[in-house]
């Protein structure tokens, strides 16, 4: 201890007091005050380290040693041997040249105070088990005056950025990474140097999302699902909605270019902005030559249950000449049992003879070598080749509003020549978020959009609301389920309005997140500054692609008008897939429309500039029939409209009469589910999108009868 007394050459009384502290430390001298917000359970958890190391360092600093020297001594020798640290620090102090002498009371020491304050924050962050280099990096970037909660957010953002940067590097195929290369060394392996540009970009997005009130887990999941290149608005929207697009960072044009470049020249087509259930038409490699089967190898989508389409199991004869067992006959529930005009059970093979089935690509033996599954959301559609006996007039189009299980699509495909359905995200053509399924025998080339061009976001569909739409409301699309309960939605808007008024129009980040979730769930819109409102029928008419005031007809209540939009096509999306009919029927066409709803198919064809020579519409809902009839009379149609109320009345005899009257049908279209008879009955969104097998059976029966007659 004599060495310690000689350290500064001053009186021994102060040194003696320090020795007293060493021998008899008071409990309070071992601690230091921290702000109340320095405890973060998600960072500390079970990994909180003991504070003994911090106490040793704090004690040495209080003894007057330089914090930098104390930290250096601890780094080099550890913190277990206090006497050794004391001896090293004493010798280091003795070897330093004496500084300028200050006499009297003027003896300022600003630098040690600054270092001590910085070191106090540093110790607090290290106690939370953050990496030392990230703590130093945060202090270097933000400064000691930054609140510790912002320090924590910054370090968490850096950790997330580092995590996804490492994952991105690991995913590079065939890339050899040199650990000595500074550009690819993770942040935790460096010092407080500046990370690369990608890390800074990810950190900035993470900090912005943290400021919006989202948790670390939510942000981490969003970045993991979408990727570090996703925009902040897309990341925030995915957290709010709980939906994560597979490849949102790729533009649709880029995807189409990639697929066009990869597809064989013989099958290169104009790719649509929708996605086929499975692609067929590419040449299949068979030794050195190609096969004419037209079956493409499709990689299975991980995480989704696979199933083979039973196209060959559902036809009269398989490619091996054996008739399948009848055990599938009872696969449907009793209430779904369908019959044809003669009272006979409708079977898949009734749609045509086996020879027509055998000409389709799925009827080859190779179908057993491939598993057909739902593709990822952004998997481009590949062209499909159908035999001449399948792809002929009358063309048919079956549209399923909402999602459907693979097992049901398997059964539907078995009834319709084994054709695979086309799954469509309506966001690609509109401001509506809904998945629809189409099964048809139309060509898939030379499609084009309806006019005027579709509006793809809420802001485009409602440009007059942009001036008062808050920046933190990052929604771009509406949900498919409309809020038909106007009373509940209005009360919700009033409650949110009072909350916004309480904070004088500036809600906190937590309030913004909560309001955004309500807006997404109930499809609320901003009709004035800080004022929300439910969607009105006029708004939905614009979003769904219908004429203004299309559903504004006498006898239709507001709630009933809103519910109609749960049972209708989005005409921009439908029109894109029907656009091929314009060149096929330049003089116009006759349409058999089953379960027409409010006339989505008819309006889509009219928007494409296709002349409707005649339309036979089957619709059980009286309000929907009146809406379609008024549109036909006011839109300048020169053809003939025949409306039928009950599908059961469309017997073979009546079909024959109608076909003689119109000269046959060029196009048969059906939407499922149909509009309910009682629109006043409350139905959940899941029930509204349920599959009605009886309705599909009627479509299959009528389509078969029409094709047999032509």
From Swiss-Prot:
Keywords on record: DNA-binding, Methyltransferase, Nucleus, Repeat, S-adenosyl-L-methionine, Transferase
Gene3D superfamilies the record matches: Vaccinia Virus protein VP39
Entry annotated with the keyword Methyltransferase: yes
Biased composition range(s): Basic and acidic residues: 339-350
GO annotation, cellular component aspect: nucleus
GO terms of biological process kind: methylation
Subcellular location(s) per record: Nucleus
Domain SAM-dependent MTase DRM-type: from-to ranges: 379-710
Annotated region (Disordered), positions in chain: 1-21, 167-192, 282-360
Domain of life: Eukaryota
Gene Ontology MF term list: DNA binding; methyltransferase activity
Tagged with keyword Flavoprotein: no
Biased composition (Acidic residues): 167-184
Domain UBA: from-to ranges: 52-92, 198-242
InterPro entries with a match to the protein in the record: SAM-dependent_MTases_sf (IPR029063), SAM_MeTfrase_DRM (IPR030380)
Subunit record text: Interacts with Pol V.
Family: Belongs to the class I-like SAM-binding methyltransferase superfamily. DRM-methyltransferase family.
Function of the protein: Catalytically inactive DNA methyltransferase that acts as regulatory factor for DRM2-mediated DNA methylation. Required for maintenance of non-CpG DNA methylation. Required for normal establishment and maintenance of RNA-directed DNA methylation (RdDM) and accumulation of specific repeat-associated small interfering RNAs (siRNAs). Required for nucleolus organizer region (NOR) nuclear organization during interphase. Acts downstream of the production of siRNAs. May promote RNA polymerase V (Pol V) transcriptional elongation or assist in the stabilization of Pol V transcripts.
Protein name, per record: Probable inactive DNA (cytosine-5)-methyltransferase DRM3
UniProt organism field: Arabidopsis thaliana (Mouse-ear cress)
Lineage: Eukaryota, Viridiplantae, Streptophyta, Embryophyta, Tracheophyta
Encoding gene, per UniProt annotation: DRM3
């Amino acid at each position: 201890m004599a060495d310690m007394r000689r350290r500064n050459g001053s009186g021994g009384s102060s040194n003696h007091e320090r020795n007293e502290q060493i021998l008899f430390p008071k409990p309070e001298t071992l601690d230091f005050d921290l702000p109340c917000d320095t405890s973060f359970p998600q960072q500390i958890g079970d990994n909180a380290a003991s504070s003994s190391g911090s106490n040793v360092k704090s004690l040495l600093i209080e003894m007057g040693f330089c914090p930098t020297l104390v930290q250096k001594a601890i780094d080099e020798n550890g913190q277990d041997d206090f006497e050794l640290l004391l001896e090293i620090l004493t010798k280091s102090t003795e070897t330093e040249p004496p500084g300028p002498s200050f006499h009297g009371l003027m003896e300022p020491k600003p630098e040690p105070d600054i270092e001590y304050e910085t070191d106090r924050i540093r110790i607090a962050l290290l106690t939370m088990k953050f990496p030392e280099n990230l703590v130093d990096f945060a202090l270097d970037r933000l400064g000691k005056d930054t609140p510790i909660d912002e320090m924590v957010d910054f370090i968490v953002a850096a950790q997330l950025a580092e995590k996804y940067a490492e994952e991105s590097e690991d995913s590079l195929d065939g890339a050899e990474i040199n650990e000595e290369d500074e550009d690819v060394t993770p942040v935790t392996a460096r010092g407080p140097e500046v990370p690369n540009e990608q890390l800074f970009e990810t950190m900035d997005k993470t900090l912005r999302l943290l400021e919006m009130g989202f948790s670390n887990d939510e942000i981490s999941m969003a970045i993991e699902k979408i990727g570090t290149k996703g925009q902040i608005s897309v990341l925030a929207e995915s957290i709010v909605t709980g939906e994560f697009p597979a490849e949102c960072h790729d533009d649709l044009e880029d995807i189409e270019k990639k697929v066009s470049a990869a597809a064989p020249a013989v099958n290169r087509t104009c790719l649509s902005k929708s996605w086929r259930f499975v692609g067929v038409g590419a040449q299949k490699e068979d030794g050195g030559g190609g096969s004419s089967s037209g079956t493409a190898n499709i990689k299975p989508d991980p995480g989704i249950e696979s199933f083979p389409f039973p196209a060959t199991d559902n036809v009269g004869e398989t490619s091996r000449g054996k008739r399948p067992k009848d055990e599938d006959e009872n696969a449907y529930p009793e209430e779904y049992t369908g019959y044809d005009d003669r009272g006979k059970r409708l079977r898949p093979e009734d749609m045509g003879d086996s020879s027509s089935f055998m000409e389709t690509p799925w009827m080859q033996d190779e179908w057993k070598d491939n598993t057909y599954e739902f593709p990822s959301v952004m998997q481009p559609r590949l062209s499909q080749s159908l035999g001449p006996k399948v792809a002929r007039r009358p063309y048919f189009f079956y549209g399923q509003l909402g999602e459907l299980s693979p097992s049901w699509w398997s059964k539907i495909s078995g009834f319709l020549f084994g054709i695979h359905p086309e799954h469509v995200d309506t966001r690609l053509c509109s401001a509506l978020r809904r998945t629809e399924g189409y099964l048809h025998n139309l060509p898939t080339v030379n499609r084009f959009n309806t006019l005027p061009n579709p509006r793809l976001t809420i802001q485009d569909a409602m440009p007059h609301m942009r001036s008062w739409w808050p920046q933190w409301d990052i929604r771009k699309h509406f949900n498919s389920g409309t809020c038909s309960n106007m009373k509940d939605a209005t009360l919700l808007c009033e409650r949110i309005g009072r909350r916004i008024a309480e904070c004088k129009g500036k809600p906190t980040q937590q309030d913004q997140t909560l309001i955004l979730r309500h807006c997404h769930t109930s499809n609320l819109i901003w009709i004035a500054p800080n004022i929300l409102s439910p969607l009105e029928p006029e708004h939905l008419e614009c979003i769904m692609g219908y004429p203004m005031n299309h559903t504004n007809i006498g006898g239709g209540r507001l709630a009933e008008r809103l519910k109609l939009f749960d049972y209708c096509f989005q005409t921009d999306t439908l029109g894109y897939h029907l656009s091929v009919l314009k060149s096929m029927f330049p003089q116009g066409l006759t349409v058999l429309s089953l379960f027409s709803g409010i006339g989505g198919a008819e309006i889509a064809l009219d928007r494409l500039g296709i002349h409707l020579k005649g339309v036979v519409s089957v619709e059980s809902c009286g309000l929907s029939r009146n809406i379609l009839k008024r549109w036909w009379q006011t839109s300048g149609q020169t053809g003939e409209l025949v409306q039928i109320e009950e599908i059961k009345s469309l017997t073979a005899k009546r079909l024959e009469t109608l076909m003689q009257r119109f000269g046959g049908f060029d196009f048969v279209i059906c939407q499922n589910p149909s509009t309910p008879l009682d629109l006043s009955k409350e139905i959940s969104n899941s029930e509204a999108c349920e599959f009605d097998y009886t309705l599909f059976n009627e479509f299959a029966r009528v389509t078969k009868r029409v094709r047999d007659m032509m």
